Amino acid sequence: MSRRYLFTSESVTEGHPDKICDQISDTILDTLLTQDPTSRVAAEVVVNTGLVLITGEITTKANVNYANIARQKIAEIGYTNADNGFSASSTSVIVALDEQSPDIAQGVNTAQETREQDSEELFDKIGAGDQGIMFGFACNETPELMPLPICLAHRIARRLAAVRKTGELSYLRPDGKTQVTVVYEDGRPVGIDTVLISTQHTATIGDITDEAAVQAKIKQDLWTAVVEPVFGDLEIKPDQETRFLVNPTGKFVIGGPQGDSGLTGRKIIVDTYGGYSRHGGGAFSGKDPTKVDRSAAYAARYVAKNIVAAGLAEKCEVQLSYAIGVARPVSIFLDTFGTGKVDDEILLGLVKDNFELRPAGIIHSFNLRNLPSERGGRFYQDVAAYGHLGRNDLDLPWERTDKADFLKQAVTHSLSAAIA
């Protein structure tokens, strides 16, 4: 008997208050790593009406102006008019930073494996920056090997920002949210149930002043300029049964930090798989690569994506866990949800033998300390909005499928050996 169900994921634009914070945090990280690739960074940002607070722990040789970094990023996002209650030029910026705790630093600088002389391997020298669990996921629903709902939500959010920035819909303002509900049948997406867009806008549009008329124009414009282009090249599209909701409160004039405070790390589901896969709870933005919340989550995605890209499973989830100050993962778990072409234990063995999952190894494999300087001073800030994963518009090392062919051959060899 077939099972039909709905699954929903959301995204937000770069002008959402929480995303402003994520982008400032990651711009700080980019700037510090560009000058000093060994910087230890845990940059947290809070925004509210007319206020930016930069706090956290940073140890670095770099010399930067944190207030200028924040203002430049705020202006780039689109907050340039003080009449909106928040702008790059008018906001106050408070900087309250400490250095990384020496108790934490000693475990990261010299991992337990090295301190206790259990290993002389290079990648055993750096310990994990904290304990924790991280998940990586991939599935074959989209070319990005990501779940369809989060891909669509991101596409709409990016298009929403694009038509604002180009002036195509000049009445739009930076804050916005999107949400897509996908119809599934027997585990495969078959339709679009609901598309929801909430977008900040001016109180009037040209000579249109009536609130209902303003909302009617916004709804029509968003369908034509945003939704239709997003779905234009896709097989699954909205149909006559699809609900299209726009600003369901009736208006969205007060937005950005004037409407809601923002905080770094508060959109972790938007940053990953839209709720389709499990999440360990750790945020990404503002954290240097020794923080396994970030680097190990990228590594787990890399593992899962290569397994799916190799055709060894239709979907794959990988869990990694770490202890602070210890280089090697405490545990590695893999689940293909019954879609694997071979037993999960065979895949797990291949992962353990062929993927480098120690923090120093992940940093080296993905070049995580040097990418900001190699890419003109910006890398992490570009993934701080519209998702860290499945970004075919960016060259991200954890999105590469360079181990897929090897995995296919290894499985074939393993099966042949078992038969022999």
Swiss-Prot record:
Keywords associated with the record: ATP-binding, Cytoplasm, Magnesium, Metal-binding, Nucleotide-binding, One-carbon metabolism, Potassium, Transferase
CDD domains hit by this protein: S-AdoMet_synt
Cofactor(s) the protein requires to work: Mg(2+); K(+)
Binding site for L-methionine: 57, 100, 260, 291
InterPro entries given in the database record: ADOMET_SYNTHASE_CS, S-AdoMet_synt_C, S-AdoMet_synt_central, S-AdoMet_synt_N, S-AdoMet_synthetase, S-AdoMet_synthetase_sfam
MF-aspect GO terms: ATP binding; magnesium ion binding; methionine adenosyltransferase activity
Chief subcellular location: cytoplasm
GO biological process: one-carbon metabolic process; S-adenosylmethionine biosynthetic process
GO cellular component term, pick one: cytoplasm
Binding site for Mg(2+): 18
Catalytic activity, as annotated: L-methionine + ATP + H2O = S-adenosyl-L-methionine + phosphate + diphosphate
Region (Flexible loop): 100-110
Localization annotation: Cytoplasm
Entry binding sites for ATP: 16, 175-177, 251-252, 260, 266-267, 283, 287
Pfam families (UniProt xref): S-AdoMet_synt_C, S-AdoMet_synt_M, S-AdoMet_synt_N
Entries under HAMAP family matching the protein: S_AdoMet_synth1
Subunit architecture: Homotetramer; dimer of dimers.
Role noted for this protein: Catalyzes the formation of S-adenosylmethionine (AdoMet) from methionine and ATP. The overall synthetic reaction is composed of two sequential steps, AdoMet formation and the subsequent tripolyphosphate hydrolysis which occurs prior to release of AdoMet from the enzyme.
Designated name of the protein: S-adenosylmethionine synthase
Species whose genome carries this gene: Trichormus variabilis (strain ATCC 29413 / PCC 7937)
Gene that produces this protein: metK
